[in-house]
UniProtKB/Swiss-Prot annotation:
The EC number(s) this enzyme carries: 1.8.-.-
Annotated family: Belongs to the thioredoxin family. DsbA subfamily.
This protein's record includes keyword Transcription: no
Polar residues: bias regions: 65-81
Signal peptide location: 1-18
SUPFAM superfamilies linked to this entry: Thioredoxin-like
Name of the protein described by the UniProt record: Putative protein-disulfide oxidoreductase RF_0032
Compartments reported by the entry: Periplasm
GO molecular function: disulfide oxidoreductase activity
Pfam family, one: Thioredoxin_4
Length: 278
């Protein structure tokens, strides 16, 4: 099933990451040291905080509404699909059941990040820019921050499946962080699947469970739908890309994203004030 979409999707993966991937493919294969990362960073502490934010977010820091976005894309059911329980995945710029969400799920200011596991710019963003954004808007429950995948390569697909394998936000954040931190050690290796399997096992996903997830229609169709949806956005040129209530930001700098978020927060406050005065 995957082979029918990887090639056309790959053509959409443009300037943001192409040069870096070409250069890195020629690097000498490195040995991955995942255990050291798991022991020496404070990922688990951040995971717990993010999970608490997602599950126990304040209900009305910014009042929720149902009128944020209207565009949606539905992926057609596969002709080869045999499982009648798998339904076409519908994607919008709102929060849905398939999304991995940090912060306040009920906020009506929704920031959607599109990233690729093999994208060097995405790794840079998460290591240098995201922590400040998280502290300012996510930890304070001001926004719903949705992390979605753009699948450009087979490596992207397999890494994204590993991150979603357990299905909960804690596990997703753990693997999301490690996959990006260790990107140069697995993404361009001929043994990338073996290295991802090692990452999974050290993070609590045994090889057999990872194999089952790789064969999961539900996970794969979610990733396909996420990718196809953003690929149809008029201004989408690559990853990372950000949308605030459906409007794409200029770039992935802290200033650009903060300006867009602050504007959306102010608009929602004014809207709430006007509704109360009626």
């Amino acid at each position: 099933m995957r082979s029918i979409f990887i090639v056309p999707i790959f053509l959409l993966f443009l300037s943001s990451c192409s040069e870096e991937k070409t250069q890195n493919k020629n690097q000498e294969e490195k040995q991955i040291i995942v255990q050291e990362t798991l022991q020496n960073n404070n990922t688990s502490q951040e995971i717990n905080q993010e999970a608490v934010n997602s599950e126990n977010a304040a209900e009305s820091i910014v009042p929720a509404n149902d009128n944020n976005q209207t565009d949606e894309v539905s992926t057609p059911p596969s002709q080869e699909q045999k499982n009648p329980e798998i339904k076409p995945v519908k994607v919008t710029f709102k929060v849905d059941d398939n999304d991995m969400v940090l912060g306040n799920k009920k906020s009506n200011v929704i920031v959607v990040e599109y990233f690729s596991p093999t994208c060097p710019h995405c790794a840079y963003y998460h290591q240098t820019i995201f922590p400040e954004l998280k502290k300012k808007y996510i930890d304070t429950n001001k926004i719903a921050y949705v992390v979605r995948e753009f699948i450009a390569t087979k490596q992207d697909l397999d890494a994204a499946i590993l991150a979603r394998c357990k299905g909960d936000i804690n596990s997703f954040v753990q693997f999301h962080n490690i996959i990006l931190q260790q990107q140069d050690k697995w993404a361009y290796s001929n043994k990338y699947r073996e290295l991802l399997t090692d990452i999974g096992q050290l993070g609590g996903v045994p090889p057999e469970e990872y194999k089952q997830c790789l064969n999961s229609d539900k996970i794969t169709e979610t990733l396909i739908a996420n990718t196809n949806f953003v690929a149809n956005a008029p201004k989408f040129i690559g990853t990372p890309s950000f949308f605030v209530n459906g409007v794409q930001t200029g770039n992935y700098s802290i200033d650009s994203i903060s300006t867009a978020v602050d504007k959306a927060l102010e608009e929602q406050k004014e809207k709430a004030k006007n509704e109360m005065s009626l």
